[in-house]
């Protein structure tokens, strides 16, 4: 699959300024640019494919056209539960930044779910036993998902992508991940 370049959707709200254009090089005809929606399928401002076979196609239409080939992480079966370190911890222990992620649900099967964060206090012993018994999801928050949902996964949060979900993962520039 070829990498596609996207042009953002710009917003010229009253409180906008010139920094996005002057400092970050955003090419926009607006005098003041309030927001630059870099990866957007929102009807009020979609990103657009810039060049190539799909030139001019809105990002949402592109995703509909190419589907799962476009991008993503595909959840299948729970084999591990990632925990992403905070910047403070990762810098101290790993020598690089931690990782916070945002997930956009590209597609999912009916009844698909994501899991993140513990829903009650756990002892170290119970946590270990739940891993051994494959019952860890029983003590994690569960979120039923639908196509188009967006989730912010703060560093330090245990999480898992359930079966039948294809996500686009936008993450902090780090590959430091601990797995349970």
What are these regions (language model features)?
Residues 90-92, 113-115, 154, 161-162, ...:
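Short helix/loop capping segments that flank catalytic or ligand/cofactor-binding pockets
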Residues 83-84, 144-163, 172:
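Conserved metal-binding segment of the jelly-roll/cupin
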Residues 1-122:
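Transition-metal
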Residues 92-95, 103, 140-142, 156-158:
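A generic local secondary-structure boundary/capping motif
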Residues 75-77, 140-149:
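Gly/lys/ser-thr-rich phosphate-binding loops in alpha/beta enzymes
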Residues 98, 135-138, 144, 152-154:
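Short solvent-exposed loop/turn micro-motifs enriched in small/polar/acidic residues
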Residues 99-102, 158, 164-167:
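Extracellular structured ligand-interaction cores
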Residues 116-139, 167-180:
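Double-stranded beta-helix
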